[in-house]
């Protein structure tokens, strides 16, 4: 019998165990369980003491060792799997679509769960002959016909859509670019730490400004709460800032919140604060299709797809942008497409289960648009909805 272990099912599963001296992890032959549930302090030891001989880890890249331990939850997953892997008689099957994200250390930490000798310095070459028996790669084209069945992968159609910045938006963006150039150049004689923080603060502002007026507004508003920084001190690495700010296929989850880490120690002067406040006021007046050409172009594309009978999904980088786009699509297209429900689902909407519920509720609407961040890129088969 297969037992799906969830908090809501624990009581029923335990009632099905015939003896009190064994746990449900010993009794049920096959278990399906979330690693985040089983690694908790309450459940970890019970599972470790009765772990099965074969363990299959899905989405294994989310349990790789993190850079500097920044992602606490992911680091806990890795440490938990490492404990399980210590038993040489235990079999591990780890599946992932993104085993190597470009971060060699994270990739090797996964391999190290299979054989500790693989978890070496990234500069040291791996023995490919020794590695080969442990790794199986199957690309999409390799499994179009799989075990006698057609897999029917959807065709991927890519296209670029240009949009024009309104004069007001273009003026704000050019002024922000000028400010960023000046603030980075002004650190020419400063210490390495200050240069690095100022650089990442500038990139944060630019990314937010290009994402949406709402993201720019949120970025600049959050900046207000930041205190002046200090000169060279022990500081986060470039990777710590990059993981917040840049798009990534890293094994760690890409955060969808506005990246303000670099502002903590950016050390803005009073004149810079006044200048940023001016940008904030201008950003507040750019929402809507009249002055935001990007959301206008998005609405035109969504309008076309709705007219063709599709239920579009719009992905955004930041939470604030996703909420803004959903609001705008509802306002722009609601009258034309009767019964339209445009809804955002982001990393701010609870855990995986809560987000699945929200997506499921939206799928019941006959005319719908989902606006999401990358938190929905895994774990939910959006094509079913």
Specify the residue positions occupied by each region the protein language model found.
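Conserved helicase motor
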Residues: 5-15, 35-40, 316-320, 340-356, ...
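Conserved helix-turn-beta segment of the N-terminal RecA-like "Helicase ATP-binding" lobe
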Residues: 1-12, 114-117, 328-337
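Conserved two-lobed SF2 helicase motor
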Residues: 24-41, 361-378
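Inter-lobe coupling linker of SF2 helicases/translocases
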Residues: 20, 27, 32-52, 64, ...
């Amino acid at each position: 019998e297969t037992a799906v272990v969830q908090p809501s099912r624990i009581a029923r599963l335990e009632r099905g165990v015939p003896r009190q001296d064994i746990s449900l992890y010993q009794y049920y032959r096959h278990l399906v369980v979330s690693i985040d549930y089983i690694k908790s302090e309450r459940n970890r030891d019970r599972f470790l003491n009765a772990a099965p001989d074969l363990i299959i880890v899905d989405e294994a890249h989310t349990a790789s060792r993190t850079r500097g331990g920044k992602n606490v939850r992911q680091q806990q997953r890795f440490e938990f799997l490492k404990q399980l892997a210590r038993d040489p008689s235990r079999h591990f099957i780890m599946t992932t679509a993104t085993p190597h994200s470009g971060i060699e250390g994270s990739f090797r930490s996964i391999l190290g769960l299979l054989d500790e000798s693989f978890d070496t310095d990234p500069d040291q070459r791996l023995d490919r002959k020794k590695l080969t028996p442990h790794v199986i790669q199957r690309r999409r084209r390799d499994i179009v016909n799989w075990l006698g069945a057609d897999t029917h992968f959807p065709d991927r159609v890519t296209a670029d859509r240009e949009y024009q910045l309104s004069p007001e938006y273009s003026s704000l963006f050019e002024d922000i670019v000028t400010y960023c150039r000046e603030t980075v150049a002004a650190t020419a004689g400063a210490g390495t730490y200050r240069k690095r923080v100022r650089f990442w603060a500038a990139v944060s502002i630019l990314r937010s400004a290009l994402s949406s007026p709402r993201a720019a507004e949120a970025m600049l508003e959050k900046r207000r709460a930041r205190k002046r920084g200090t000169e060279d001190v022990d500081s986060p690495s470039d990777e710590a800032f990059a993981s917040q700010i840049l798009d990534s296929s890293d094994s760690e989850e890409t955060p969808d919140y506005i990246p303000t880490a670099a502002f903590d120690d950016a050390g803005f002067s009073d004149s810079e604060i006044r200048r940023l406040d001016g940008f904030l006021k201008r950003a507040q007046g750019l929402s809507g299709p009249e002055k935001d050409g990007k959301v206008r172009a998005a609405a035109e594309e969504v309008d076309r797809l709705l007219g063709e009978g599709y239920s579009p999904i719009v992905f955004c980088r930041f939470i604030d942008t996703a909420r803004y786009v959903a609001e705008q699509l509802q306002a722009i297209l609601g009258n034309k497409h009767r019964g339209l429900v445009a809804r955002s689902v982001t990393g701010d909407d609870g855990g995986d289960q809560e987000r699945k519920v929200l997506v499921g509720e939206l799928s019941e609407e006959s005319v719908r648009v989902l606006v999401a961040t990358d938190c929905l890129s895994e774990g939910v088969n959006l094509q079913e909805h």
